[in-house]
Amino acid sequence: MKRFAAALLAISLVLGLSACSSPAPELQEFTDGVHERDEVYPAHIETKSVALGGLGIHFSTSAFDETASPELAQKVAEDYSALSGAGETDIYIINGPLTDAPFVSGAELFCTAEAVESGEYRPALVSAALGITGRWQAEGLSRELFGGEVPDGLADEIAAYLAAHEGSNLLSLAPFYFTEDFADAETIALASDCAQSLAAYVIGEAGQDALRGSCAEYLPGWLKSLGLEAETDGLQTLMELDWTQNVYYPAEFTRSVFTFRPVPTEWMTDADAASAYVLRLCTGLDWLLDYLETNAPESWARIEQTRPYEVRFEENIDASCTDVYSAVVHLRAPSAGLHELAHALTIDEPCGEAGWVFEGVAMHCTEWWISYEDYGIFFDLMENIDTVEGASEDERFIFGEIRRIFKELSGVDASEAQTLESPAIPLVKAMTYAMLLHPERDVFIKMVSKPTGDVMSSFYKPRYPSTELSHAKSYAFCEYLLEHGYLTFDQLAAASLDLEGYRAAFPTDEYFDELYAGYLDWLREEFGS
């Protein structure tokens, strides 16, 4: 009975929407035109164009055929007329488009003649003509309007997929599940079926206009209608992201001041992995913003004015970094994600003297986010250094010290590190303390990807022990200053923002040296063996 009702609803939707549409107007004469290059679609296109009411159809001159193009334009006009409430729309049918899939920018659509002939362009047409920008919403409504069918066993197919892909975010219907960059044909087909089913449910509950929103609030009800149960908080977070299209990237979304442009990487190989990492990163960013606003109220006025940043996911760079001058965050590894976002928020006017504070502040805000797996190699060495073939005597000694100090800090043995909520915090402190307590040992732990003397000496305060300085040592010193009341986090955040804030916290080199000497004395007293 439930299936019959759902089928009846789908039929009534298509019939009702079609009844409201208008017949396609007759073609007029084609005229010469041009699409000027712009930031969104950077291509100069000379065209043969025809206007049909609110619809403009533009063939690039290389794609125009005097016989075939009028027939294709008539097909587009018929599809457009099936869309009730369609606004003014321009469709560019071109050879060699900038993207393999149809691309939408506002009310403009760019695609190939083959995409029109096959119907592949229809979700993009729905998006451009009706202002429905969500990827799954456009896909689902397009299938509803143009005769797509949801299989009777959709719930079983979803259940089977989720059973085979533990932790999958398929039900978020994030754009990753609709693109060949991240998903195979079977996954895309299942996501499309889900999109149509959910779109029909939303229309039945609130009408077609509701599809212009995220529709996250309808997810629990839709799942219930299918007889499925799932934890929806994370799924709804992904649905609520401000997803957009970009000609150079398979997916794009904005959160706070950051525009993220995910691409396949070694840690985001498919839709499930990409959506999981994006969810983790966005959840961390939300926490970070709240922490900065709450704990650095004096600096927050500056922080919330941070200019927009682009976040790129890249594997062809040496290390993750934040380019403050060009406002670009480069992510080379998953563990660096929130750390680099913290840099973007807490560095306004870079100065070399404050370099170590940059790192300390960023790690203070984000080290809880680092997982056991992110620092797996260090946990493994701490626990098993005695059995590592080729390890030097100094390395065995240092990691033995790290193991001892880690237990003092955390209360658990190295073998139990995974039971801790934030295992990276005691690990990084233990590594730092062990290195500072035993500078005579010939060991260097790489907590940065390029720990060269040139980089260190040019970036960090010269009088600080720059040849030994790392992110971890900066972090541990900042933690000491905070825990012993020498500075508030607000003061440290201000010190990271610009030179004026740094000088307010550390007015002279002598004062800095005094603080650091006191830190080393405390370290020897508390953790010296």
Model-derived features: positions:
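Sec-exported extracytoplasmic/periplasmic mature domains
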Residues: 81-85, 126-134, 146-151, 163, ...
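Active-site-proximal alpha-helical
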Residues: 163-224, 393-508
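Zinc-dependent metallopeptidase catalytic helix centered on the HExxH motif
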Residues: 103-163, 324-434
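Juxtacatalytic substrate-recognition/specificity segment
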Residues: 44-135, 151, 254-354
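C-terminal motif of bacterial Sec signal peptides marking the signal peptidase cleavage site
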Residues: 16-19
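Stable alpha-helical elements in mature extracytoplasmic
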Residues: 72-79, 117-122, 137-141, 191-198, ...
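Beta/coil-rich, acidic/histidine-enriched accessory regions frequently appended to metallopeptidases
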Residues: 22-34, 49-52, 58, 63-64, ...
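Positively charged n-region of N-terminal signal peptides that target proteins for export
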Residues: 1-4
